[in-house]
Amino acid sequence: MNGARSLLATMVANGVTTVFANPGTSEMHFVAALDDATDVRAVLCLFEGVATGAADGYARVTGRPAATLLHLGPGLANGWANLHNARRARVPLLNVIGDHATYHARYDAPLQSDIAAVAGALDGPVFNPQRPEDVAAETARAIAGAYGPPARVATLVLPADVSWGEVATPPAHWPVAAPTSAPVPDEGLIHLAATRLRTTRSAIFLGSAATTQSLMDLAQRIGAASGAKVMVETFPTTMDRGAGVVQPERLIYLSEFAVAQLADLKTLVLIGANEPVGFFAYPDVPSRLVGPDCHVVALAPPGVDAGAALAALVDQLDAPSAATPSGVAPEPPSGALTTASFAAAIAATMPEHAILSDESNTSGIHLYGATAFAAPHRLLTLTGGAIGFGLPVAVGAAIGSSSRVIALESDGSMMYTLQALWTMAREALDVTVVVLSNRRYAILDFERQRVGATGAGDASERLLALDRPTIDFCGLARAMGIPATLVATAHDLVDALRRSYATEGPSLIEVPLPSAF
């Protein structure tokens, strides 16, 4: 029994049975140990950013951590952007990184780096066992740290000699992380929130811990009883949506519009969320989105029991059941492909219980409204703003769930983690990839104006346009073993979506869109 086998045995004892891996030399004993770990599903990813994003997606749909397997500091660096998204999503994730042998580090070999410093920037705990005998206990501590609350990215750095070294006396029972319950909200804050909801113009602001159907139902009851509007953060980790589900008002992404959206509020009650702030700074636009006379009540910030907070407010307000708004999904569209017809096609065809991994960016401007009364589904969004999340998260969601996953990908973002297509094909995952190809970084056209950057000459245009050459997304998909279709009309898109949903395994649909949104 060596350190690597001890790590795997402890993972299995704690229910961590999926590993998204891009291994190197330092991880070979872990890889070898997988041959005997029949309870573990090991998934090869061709780029570390796919592995980390897949672990994020898996956690979003299961509520449980998957593990990554990364190679030294550069492997961690390659996967860091999607670990950042996982940090912002507040999902549990066990980030396993192989390191040089403990005695080799002092020689400053080419791949030597300060792994703990890079991992520490994720704001989660970092564990570094120095003996094979320490691996099991440190792994259990890391898994406990991943669960939180709040959930976090927990990193375990495994030196090569600790991995291959023998455990002198394996434990009779592998250590199991003790679960920790989220603290309940402060009674005084509950009373304050209830009083202000009754007496001031208010909103309940829901974060990712409060976006299940049952908790949004409670929020709807509170809103109906108090007159407060129910809002949701711009980019929730996972959100139940569709017909029969409460539809909170989504905070607008653009800061100046979000400021106007919140301007008349005197109270903002936070449930599972932090206070909203601008995504970026802009000239003459405040970073803080609520007005100066708005009282923000942090009733249940991340890590505090959001369900208990909502239930307490229901009791305080004696809030009766409230009707859920009803409506119908759009009809299948025809005619030209536009951002509106694309959104309508998704809404009209979406199968029940689908999972929507949404990195449509500017091309998805109509998506939230169009899918309000689509078939019930789960929405996964770009929590941390680091693009290249949609395809990897779709991989993890498909492995963690039996539902059809629909990955909506803008063309620029797709090129960050294109290797995820290969993993979809190899694992035969039921993922429909919809590439929204407007052939430019369209968001930057808009942002250039917003920040007051002048000029639109040839040099700046070359940094925003995705042409010369035009990317053949269908060709790229086929090269990785995925059937692909290029559509020309909205009717074609509807047909292609329906065929995809009826066919096992992955497929890709390329949707050409106008460059302006």
Region annotations inferred by a language model:
Residues 65, 201-203, 355, 378, ...:
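Residues that mark the start of a beta-strand
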Residues 2, 133, 157, 171, ...:
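Phosphate/pyrophosphate-binding active-site segments
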